[in-house]
């Protein structure tokens, strides 16, 4: 769950907006006690990118096949090959967290009102609104979805 550990943590322990009420996120259930402790004890603000945000924004096969050829072993291309292959669209769960952590004030995402996250014994997460809560969840409008998709295609294939 390591993310951008500055004054604010941006990560992607998932499914807080309750759009997928019975989704159990892998990064939560793989170490349930750690996830529960993390949300109960983390001392600084958290901005999390929920499962539903990364699910909406896809990396296209054309981008994965054509835009990462400028290096022999592009790490993103390798990850996509290992996960589902290059013939399938790929969700961008990790990339949404990275984009927010790197460019939080550029309007790529909205954020929810503050709240607290609970993680139950099955690994289901819930955000309960609370004015002094330390967790906010990324939100995504239709316009932001298009903008983030385009940004990913440009940034992930940019030659250094």
Give names to the regions the model predicted:
Residues 1-160:
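N-terminal acidic, glycine/proline-rich low-complexity segments
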């Amino acid at each position: 769950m390591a993310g951008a550990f500055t004054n604010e943590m941006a990560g992607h322990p998932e499914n807080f907006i309750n759009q997928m009420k019975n989704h159990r996120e892998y990064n939560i259930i793989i170490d349930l006690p750690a996830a529960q402790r993390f949300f109960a004890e983390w001392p600084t603000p958290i901005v999390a990118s929920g499962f539903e945000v990364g699910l909406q924004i896809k990396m296209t096969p054309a981008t994965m096949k054509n835009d990462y050829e400028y290096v022999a072993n592009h790490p993103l291309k390798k990850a996509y090959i290992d996960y589902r292959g290059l013939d399938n669209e790929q969700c961008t769960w990790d990339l949404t967290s990275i984009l927010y952590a790197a460019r939080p004030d550029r309007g790529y995402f909205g954020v929810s009102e503050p709240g607290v996250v609970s993680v139950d014994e099955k690994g289901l997460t819930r955000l309960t609104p609370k004015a002094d809560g330390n967790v906010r969840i990324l939100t995504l409008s239709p316009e932001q979805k298009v903008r983030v998709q385009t940004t990913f295609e440009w940034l992930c294939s940019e030659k250094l």
